[in-house]
Amino acid sequence: MRQPKIIVVGGGLAGLMATIRVAEAGVPVELFSIVPVKRSHSVCAQGGINAAKNTKGEGDSTDKHFDDSIYGGDFLANQRPVKAMCEAAPGIIDLLDRMGVMFNRTPEGLLDYRRFGGTLYNRTAFAGATTGQQMLYALDEQVRRFEAEGKVKKYEGWTFLSAVMDDSGVSRGVCAMDLKSMEVRTFPADAAIFCTGGIGAIFARSTNSVVCTGSAQSALFQQGVHYANGEFIQVHPTAIPGEDKLRLMSESARGEGGRVWVPKKSGDSRPPRQIPAGERFYFLEEWYPKYGNLVPRDIATRAIHNVVFEMKLGLDGEPAVYLDLTHIPRETLDRKLEGILEIYEKFLGVDPRVEPMKVFPGMHYTMGGIWIDNQNQATNVSGIYAAGECEYQYHGANRLGANSLVSCIYGGMVAGPASVRYARGLDKGCESVEASVFERERKRQEELNERLLRQEGSENPIAIWKEMGAWMTEHVTVVRRNKDLERTDAKLQELLERYKKINLSDRTKWSNQTLNFARELYNMLILARVITLGALARNESRGAHYKPEFPERDDANWLKTTRAMWDCGSIKLLHDPVDISLIPPRARRYDVAK
């Protein structure tokens, strides 16, 4: 019996879990990561991971977790996979605990849980404020065990360029580039699982790592893989402003009692500690008394925008609000939030234990991503699977805080075995594919590199990237207007024309970051158009997608998944009905209990 082979692209939580599941099935895995695995963006996840264990006796259940997730996502998520994820979540926590993740515990020794946005229950297990790091390190230890046994081979410092497709449109492997030697190679595989994370670089400044470009998703899209719900971009309400990039201030700060406020008087320039409580506007608590500072992220973000831009109550002219932890005991802050407080203190030079933090919304997450089916994390292209933030399945129009980590782990747990079943069911594996198929793709990618290196143009790729980011951030984040979306798409097409005249400052063939960035830039521009066109088409407001011209949710016309496809060099949009068989849609309100 032939031995199949699986490739996993991406070394974050979803990629590592998929790798573990494939290796457990006895199938060899090649794991590709653009950075060392422990530097994958999952390491930046702070607040925790959701599971309805009900250890605090509040009456929580997996059904309530499921309802909160569908309701929080404004009913746009297909319901059966979300239900399966919520039912699997308690077992995932137990698995991670056995792997050695250092979750916080109560004095009795039980796992501790905190409350996050969009729920009234303490449902979020956490490891201080560095939950992603602890989980990533624990999973990598398991992968390294398989690596020592020869079941896993890592390719760190390699970037994915394209899938290798045979003449019938089936994926037979990947083409990748070594970022040191710039060598382009093809790697045969019976199936490939893509766990390539977020797309923050499309918006220039975001809370994402700089390697989160969406380039892999875009490359697959241009090879025929469908992309779903691209228009749904999560803007986190509490990011730490920065000139170079944004840094996240976790929702856990509010989960532990942090309060968001601004001075009631516009232009009040007094230091925050000198402003009496009666002169502070705790707007989230006033507008949403049931959920307070833990309303879902899209609602909190729009509220902050309203306070700053419409009511003109920013902090002394700055687009910012206060996130106040100064009333919380120092011991509690150091035990539960030390990691994120150190980040704020390091970059802004202010101790948030004694002075309120200045925060403002920033691009954080994409609910949209690669289209996958409801059962196997399989795309529309045979042999290609996806898991984690790069796919669209679990969060609908708005992700609840701490659902991302559980969706990463669950997606990897499903994709791994599904890819093994597919590979074992093939009549002919990748070893039977003619060598010319792989050589053809390798040569195509080599020629693209050579063309970029030879190009004698006048355009700077960094300047094009900054323009793209500025337009996307201004027009395709919190508030969308059709005329602005039309202008943005026209600008993106102009940037694509200018891209044809780029000039690379580095023409060497060793560790050429400029070449890799130029390749990624083209893919980012294509994916930016997918996002913008999806937003332009959707004439309603749902979750993170808000249009003042169409302020209401429109279930009659838009309770549909946007599915983008690449059609001979142009972007075509389809709209599929959403599975609402388990929970009928209802009005989404957070000013009162559900």
Please name every model-derived segment.
Residues 35-68, 234-237, 244-248:
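Conserved N-terminal glycine-rich FAD pyrophosphate-binding loop of Rossmann-like flavoproteins
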Residues 1-14:
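Beta1/beta-strand and adjacent pyrophosphate-binding region of the FAD-binding site
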Residues 2-4, 182-191, 380:
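Core beta-strand elements of the Rossmann-like FAD/NAD(P) dinucleotide-binding domain
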Residues 219, 226-346, 350, 418-424:
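An anion/pyrophosphate-binding glycine-rich loop and adjacent beta-alpha core
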